[in-house]
Amino acid sequence: MAIYHLSAKPISRSAGRSATGAAAYRAGVEITDERTGLVHDYTRKGGVLHSELILPGGGTADRAEFWNGVEAHHKRGDAVLVREIEISLPTELTAEQRKALAVGYARALADRYGVAADVALHAPRTVTDRELEKHPDQYHETDPKTGRRHNGNWHAHILLSACHVQPDGTLGKKAVELDPIHCQRAKIENLVDRERVRWGELANAALEHHGHAARIDHRSHAKRGIEAEPTRHLGPAAAGIERRTGEESRRRHDFEREAMERLARAQAQGVLERESRGLERSIFDLSGDMRAAFQERDRLREQQERAERERREQERAREAQRQQEKQQADKAASDQREAERILAQLLEKAPVVDRKTEKAIDGLFHDIARSRSRGRGR
C-alpha cells in the first residue's frame, strides 16, 4: 500500500547531535568523530539496505572523511550541521526500483541545492506476535521469502549538508535555501513545502512507469478532508529497543496513550460545541444589558479620573502657595539682618549721641524686634 510521507528536520550541536553520529546511524557503519573523539558504532544496527554519499555532479566521497570535514567546517557551538529529509518508499515497487527511486531523488537534491546528499534505505520494522495480539487490525505484510512480518514502511533517510559543496568535495558557504528561517524572511517556500510536491510527483511517476495504479498525495489528511490519527516516528533509541527485545517500547505506549487522550478530548469537544451554541443564544439576549453595564463602568471610571486630576491640581496650588510664603519670610529675615548690621556700624562710628538720635535709634530697634516677632509668627 503506497503511503505518503516526507519530513525534514535539522541536526544541530545545540541539541547534542553531530553530523558524524547521524551519518553513522543512517548508514549502519562506524565513524570516529575527530572533533570530539567519540566513536559512533552502528555496525550491528541491521536493516540498512543501501547507503550512498552523493556530491553535486554525481561524484562521491569517503563518508567518515566528508562528515568529519563538515564538523570541522562549522565553528559555532549551536551550528546546524545537517538537514535531514525522510521519505516513505512505495511498497508496490521492487527492492531495486525503490533503490533507484531514492538514490535518484537524493542525486536531484544534491544537484538542485549544490549540497552533499547521504542517502540510506532502511527496511520496515518487524511486527511481533505480541503486537498483533494487541492490535490485530494493524497493517502488516509478510515477506514471501523469509516469512518475516513487517509494517510495510520501506523508507529512506537523506542527510543534506547545511553548507554548499563543490563537485570535488570542497565545502562552501551556508545553503540558506535549506534554512526555513531564511525562507520565511525572503517570503519563499521552505524546503518541506517545495519538496513535498516534488517527491509526490517523482514517486507517482515511478509507480506509473512500473505499471501500478496506486498513487500518493502530498496533501495532509486535513486538507483532503480525511479524519485520521497522524502516525508518529519512534526515533532511533526506541526503535533499537524494539529490535533487540521484540517488545513494544515505552515511547510507543506513550504515543498510544496520547492518541486515546486526543480522541477523548475530541469527543468532549463535540459535547462542548453543542452546549456552546445554547450559551451563545443566551449571551445574545444579555448583550444589551452588558453594553449598558460597560457604559456605566466607563462613566464611573472617567468620573474617578477627573476627581483625581482635580485633587492633584489643588495639591500643586497649595504647594506653590507654601513656597511663595517661605520665600517672603526668607526675604524679611534677610532685610532684618541687613538693618541690624547698618545700625551696628552707626553705633561704632558715633558712640555718643544726642537725645533726639538716641530716640530714633530706639524706635528703629523697636521696629526690628516687631518685624522679628511677625517672622516667627509665620
Swiss-Prot record:
Q: Where is this region: Disordered?
A: 130-149, 212-253, 300-338, 358-378
Q: Where is the composition biased (Basic and acidic residues)?
A: 130-146, 212-232, 241-253, 358-370
Family matches, as Pfam families: MobA_MobL
Q: Which InterPro entries match?
A: MobA_MobL (IPR005053)
From the record, give the transmembrane residue ranges.
none
UniProt keyword terms in alphabetical order? Conjugation, Mobility protein, Plasmid
Q: What's the stated role of this polypeptide?
A: This protein is essential to promote the specific transfer of the plasmid in the presence of conjugative plasmids.
Query: Into which family does the record put it?
Result: Belongs to the MobA/MobL family.
> In its UniProt entry, what is this protein called?
Mobilization protein MobL
Gene name in the database record: mobL
